[in-house]
A protein has these predicted regions:
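Generic signature of intrinsically disordered, low-complexity, basic-rich segments
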Residues: 12, 26-28, 125
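Bacterial N-terminal signal peptides that target proteins for export
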Residues: 2-18
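Bacterial N-terminal signal peptides
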Residues: 15-27
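Long, compositionally biased, intrinsically disordered segments
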Residues: 31-209
């Protein structure tokens, strides 16, 4: 008669379960955790038309970035509040560039471009879309004094582990606000947001101030 140790079977099954859960968690982590930062601005095109511009900074150790975003939030009010709505708009990617700080002779750690888990590097992904704030659903914004601030917002998952200003794995939100009342008071009725002249510093040298 063969004696089977039930305790040994239980321990073996538990080990298998823990290994499976560990693999599952690692797989989940590998699919996200790639957002290092982003900024959002707008360019006036005239006649109430604007180009929205999103610059998304991807950690090349994480997942690849999508070719477009199709969901954008907007809300109108004073002091960036009130009347939140969803507005479906296609933010198409118009460019990708490697902004990893490195020696000129060093190869790119983000090669191939926009490929998951390639190395310790940073990519800048630029997304754009045109809107007309004189037409629906923005009709009426800025005509009085109640709804002056038109704020656009989008989110992307997930924040990477290197970010210390908030929880890792949480959604990363970015906003841009147009004060339509102030624009309407201008002679040219047109305003463009400030543009950053330098790319963000993703990595700093040891002992660098």
């Amino acid at each position: 008669m063969v004696k089977i140790n039930s305790n040994w079977i239980t321990i073996t099954r538990l080990k298998s379960l823990f290994l499976f859960l560990g693999f599952l968690l690692c797989s989940m982590g590998a699919k996200a955790d790639h957002v290092m930062g982003s900024d959002m601005g707008y360019q006036c095109l005239g006649g109430g038309k604007y180009k929205l511009i999103i610059k998304f900074y991807r950690d090349c150790r994480g997942a690849s970035a999508p070719p477009s975003w199709s969901l954008l939030y907007w809300y109108a009010g004073n002091n960036q509040g009130q009347s939140t709505s969803r507005y479906s708009i296609s933010m198409s990617r118009v460019g990708i560039r490697d902004i990893t700080p490195r020696c000129s002779t060093a190869s790119s750690p983000c090669s191939p471009q926009n490929t998951s888990y390639t190395g310790d590097g940073v990519e800048e992904h630029t997304y754009e879309a045109n809107i007309d704030i004189s037409k629906s659903p923005f009709t009426g914004v800025g005509l009085g004094t109640t709804y002056c601030d038109l704020t656009f917002a989008y989110n992307q998952c997930c924040r990477n582990a290197a970010i210390t200003t908030g929880a890792t794995w949480a959604d990363f939100w970015t906003t841009a606000t147009i004060n339509v009342c102030n624009v309407n008071k201008m002679k040219v009725k047109c305003n463009t947001s400030p543009q950053l002249s330098n790319v963000p510093v993703g990595y700093a040298c040891c002992n660098q101030a």
